[in-house]
């Protein structure tokens, strides 16, 4: 992955996907006008916040291009997801190296990992929650950690709610306590709502104040 990352980083190339520029545009527009306009409906608040944060940090550190700061975060996300995928394979008792490398070196996976796009970060949070649900039942604050990770995944991309359904079904199959299942579902929904609400409240106030 590093061999592919270095030339992309040096050129500060955020990728050819228009969605990458739309995400950056959401942050720039908010800074310029104070108005939140989703990069694409229904919005990707966690990733858009991350873009804003890294743009600020990049400027503070004096990087030549703020895009380089974003690419560093994206690369670290890629590496973290690679490690997580490897851990999933390890838990099966068979490393299955061929399948692991087929995943982490597949063109679609690498392109997503080296572009400023939200897929990998959402997957990292979602699969981390699934990993805890499968293998870390004895962990302190198990339910809260799962809910937080799921909420972040949903905050990155709303369609990541699929991870919540998978984990709830998994717990039902394992005949976990129904109160535990309910707490995870409720906490995830509430936390996800908190992530989306400020942004849509900002957009709603803009439209009502300007009578659009």
Regions found by a protein language model. Give the residues of each.
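Membrane-interface alpha helices of multi-pass inner-membrane proteins
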Residues: 100, 143-157, 164-168
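Specific aromatic-rich, kink-prone transmembrane helix
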Residues: 32, 84-87, 102, 121-138, ...
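Short acidic/glycine- and proline-prone juxtamembrane loop motifs at membrane-interface regions
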Residues: 40-41, 111-121
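Perimembrane helix-loop-helix junctions
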Residues: 135-139, 162-190
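Membrane-lumen/periplasm interface segments of specific transmembrane helices
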Residues: 180-212
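Extracytoplasmic catalytic/substrate-binding loops of multi-pass membrane glycan-assembly enzymes
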Residues: 11-26, 37-54
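Transmembrane-helix motifs of polytopic, lipid-linked glycan transferases
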Residues: 1, 68-93, 125-128, 132
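Loop-to-helix entry region of an early transmembrane alpha helix in multi-pass inner-membrane enzymes
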Residues: 41-45, 49, 59-83, 112
